[in-house]
Amino acid sequence: MKLILREDVENLGKGGDLVDVKPGYGRNYLLPRGLAVSANPKNVKELEHQKAVAAAKAAKLKASAQAVAKRLSETPVTLKRKVGEQDKLYGSVTALDVAEALAARGVQLDRRSIVLDEPIKTLGEFEVPVKLHSEVAGKVKVTVEAEAE
């Protein structure tokens, strides 16, 4: 019996997969629970259409992420912080600080997409990785300078 899964089913497949199951399993478990629909020509055609729409949407998201990555590489960020002895910062520079500085330059990013293993605590230039999409990552150049007293 051929069915199209509506949701992920453990040990069988993911939502949208066309699967071949034993008739009893399909009739008595998958269909009554709404986990699958029969694979008639109409449903198969609708599935193909949904997959095409999803693929187009994914391609559009990836393209916009690549555009943001390009823009990030062209947008250096300079942050001024108070420093103590031996150029140690009072406090630190966090992902939120970088996100706010980028927002001031017109690049809106969620702070969780900025990958800082640990906050920046010294002066200097840093390449900070940014996770924009599952397949696209960018880098932003962050310069931490001493604030004029």
UniProtKB/Swiss-Prot annotation:
Keywords, in A-Z order: Ribonucleoprotein, Ribosomal protein, RNA-binding, rRNA-binding
SUPFAM superfamilies cross-referenced by the UniProt entry: L9 N-domain-like (SSF55658), Ribosomal protein L9 C-domain (SSF55653)
InterPro entries, per the entry: Ribosomal_bL9, Ribosomal_bL9/RNase_H1_N, Ribosomal_bL9_bac/chp, Ribosomal_bL9_C, Ribosomal_bL9_C_sf, Ribosomal_bL9_N, Ribosomal_bL9_N_sf
Single GO MF annotation: structural constituent of ribosome
A Gene Ontology term for the protein's cellular component: ribonucleoprotein complex
Gene Ontology terms: biological process: translation
Transmembrane regions: none
HAMAP family: Ribosomal_bL9
Record's function text: Binds to the 23S rRNA.
Name of this chain's protein: Large ribosomal subunit protein bL9
